[in-house]
């Protein structure tokens, strides 16, 4: 469910041009018990000038299923169900668009002018899905100027920072709901990781216009995953050491 109250304000947040202006709703997917990630997201959002009094900003209590069913893991199923419910609510509310963030999203330190150019142009162009954060690099593509959007038809992992426009929301909801009714391995798409489902949706609907931010404005934070479970995150003591290493890596390298 979506929490009714906006997130609390952070004292001393510097004024800045909001990166997220122009979206009807901004949702952060967060497991209630992952208070560490919520705190990190509060810092990240304040860094880009998000107004904590803005009623468009919501924290979504991520799903925690008790059975994984045909999904790769409990976390994968919970992630899928969370994104689907957020989109169902967006459809019911007849939103013009929605920006969805996962709670391991870190915003990059690109110049404010680049971020402003991307935001301004997004809302004056034609698009269905827009990935503000993605793993695709344009460093070796001289034709891609910083601050531009790039049409993309290829597949990639990650769904930590993406937007969906109004006309694509019903089609995406219908596609995802169909996946929940199919068996694993179904040729049209069965239970799978959510980012894989987005890839299949775009492959089966080539008219859907997907744009990637050039450059990517957000990457996934190095932290314990609730979706991809690692053996070292399950061992007491060792998991704390790994967490310290991740925190040190983030401090040193961002």
Language model: regions and residue ranges:
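An acidic/histidine-cluster motif and surrounding catalytic segment
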Residues: 1-101, 105-254
């Amino acid at each position: 469910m979506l929490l009714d109250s906006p997130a609390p304000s952070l004292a001393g947040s510097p004024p800045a041009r909001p990166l997220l202006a122009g979206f009807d709703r901004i949702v952060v997917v967060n497991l209630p018990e992952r208070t560490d990630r919520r705190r990190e997201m509060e810092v990240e959002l304040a860094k880009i000038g998000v107004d904590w009094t803005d009623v468009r900003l919501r924290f979504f209590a991520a799903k925690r299923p008790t059975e994984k069913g045909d999904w790769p893991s409990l976390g994968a199923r919970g992630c899928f169900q969370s994104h689907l419910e957020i989109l169902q609510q967006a459809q019911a509310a007849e939103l013009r668009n929605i920006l969805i963030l996962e709670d391991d999203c870190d915003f990059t330190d690109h110049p404010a002018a680049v971020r402003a150019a991307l935001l301004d142009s997004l809302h004056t162009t034609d698009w269905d899905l827009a990935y503000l954060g993605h793993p695709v690099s344009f460093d070796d593509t001289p034709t891609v100027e910083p601050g531009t959007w790039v049409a993309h038809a290829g597949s990639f992992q990650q769904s930590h920072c993406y937007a969906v426009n109004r006309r694509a929301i019903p089609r995406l909801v219908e596609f995802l709901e169909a996946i929940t009714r199919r068996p694993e391995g179904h040729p049209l798409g069965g239970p799978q990781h959510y980012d894989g489902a987005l890839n299949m949706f775009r492959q089966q609907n080539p008219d859907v216009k997907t744009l990637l931010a050039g450059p990517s404005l957000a990457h996934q934070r190095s932290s314990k995953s609730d979706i991809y479970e690692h053996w070292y995150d399950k061992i007491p003591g060792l998991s704390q050491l790994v967490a310290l290493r991740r925190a040190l890596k983030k401090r040193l390298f961002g």
